[in-house]
A protein has these predicted regions:
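Extended, highly charged
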Residues: 1-224, 228-328
């Protein structure tokens, strides 16, 4: 957490507030016409030697994993009706030399809604996957509804954190943009209505390690991405993360803190001074709320704050309420 604070330029106890302020004062991304670092080397699916297993050094983390996983890919797509774009992080498994499976949690993520709508239109959904970007983009991409509703581009949160817009570049093989300073970019299309079994190559029954610390079950309802191209920097650096780790706790937990703080502050201004998504809950299951009571009638409002947090975040299981003199 101290390293994240140093990377984002604030104190570790103020990370949630920093992200909350960034979400309230977004700076939209821009499309640049300069030569993008992520396109220094280009591989097209039509190349004779094109093979994702060789081009992307994605790790297989455990003996029972469904395959090599991309876990730090910034998935960027645009809604086919509104033209509004979104970035999120999803687990993706390399299934063949030109195919990825992508797990989109039903009903909870924007790109899932975009893929559903594209399927209704019987059209593929163009998607870029940018790997190896700066920390502001990675943390900003982990925001979820209700703080960032459908149509809210989380790259604008990263822009606010960086105090400068995120630069995008047009993809070379699909009608979509990618993050210009990425190490790798995978360009492809989510196939309309096509679902695949995540462990179709291994048949282990598992996907990969999840954030609570156990191996997650393989999904039978993963969407299929047909890859069109891979671009990367000269001598690119691959970035990855697995679920049970302090790195994942920060990626998931700090945006959760910001979202809870933002929601409660709207309903009960000034009554909650800070929020901490404790590592014991993986950044999702447990939150500590630091409450401020100025008059005797404030007693009870801390319970209202807890109920607000529970109502907004279905994954939340425990909320601990403390006074403002407790160091969280």
């Amino acid at each position: 957490r101290e390293r994240v604070a140093a990377l984002l330029g604030c104190k570790k106890g103020a990370l949630g507030k920093l992200l909350c302020d960034a979400a309230l004062h977004p700076i939209e991304p821009v499309v640049s016409d300069r030569k993008a670092p992520c396109q220094e080397v280009i591989h097209r699916v039509t190349d004779e030697d094109f093979d994702l297993f060789k081009l992307i050094p994605a790790p297989t983390n455990t003996p029972v994993d469904a395959g090599p996983y991309i876990t730090m890919g910034m998935c960027y797509a645009t809604h086919p009706d509104t033209g509004l774009s979104d970035v999120t992080i999803h687990r993706m498994c390399i299934q063949s030399k030109d195919e990825l499976s992508i797990f989109l949690q039903p009903g909870s993520r924007h790109i899932g809604a975009m893929a559903e709508r594209a399927t209704q239109l019987n059209k593929p959904l163009p998607i870029s996957i940018s790997i190896g970007v700066d920390p502001a983009i990675e943390v900003g991409s982990c925001f979820e509804p209700p703080t960032t509703p459908l149509g809210y581009n989380e790259l604008s949160i990263a822009g606010a954190i960086r105090k400068a817009p995120v630069e995008l570049t047009p993809c070379i093989s699909i009608k979509e943009n990618a993050i210009a300073n990425a190490e790798y970019v995978i360009e492809g299309e989510i196939q309309p209505g096509v679902k695949v079994i995540e462990d179709q190559n291994t048949h282990t029954g598992y996907a990969m390690p999840e954030f609570p610390g156990y191996n997650g079950a393989a999904s039978h309802e993963c969407w299929l991405i047909k890859v069109k191209a891979v671009t990367h920097r000269e001598n690119p650096i691959m970035q990855t993360v697995i679920g049970p780790s302090e790195e994942h706790v920060n990626l998931a937990g700090i945006p959760t803190e910001a979202s809870i703080f933002n929601m409660i502050n709207k309903a009960l201004p000034g009554k909650v001074t800070n929020v901490y998504a404790h590592p014991s809950g993986g950044g999702k299951y447990m939150a500590i709320l630091q409450c401020k009571k100025t008059v005797h009638t404030d007693e009870g409002k801390q319970k209202q704050a807890a109920l607000l947090a529970f109502s907004a975040f279905p994954e939340l299981k425990h909320v601990i309420l403390v006074d403002e003199d407790v160091d969280i």
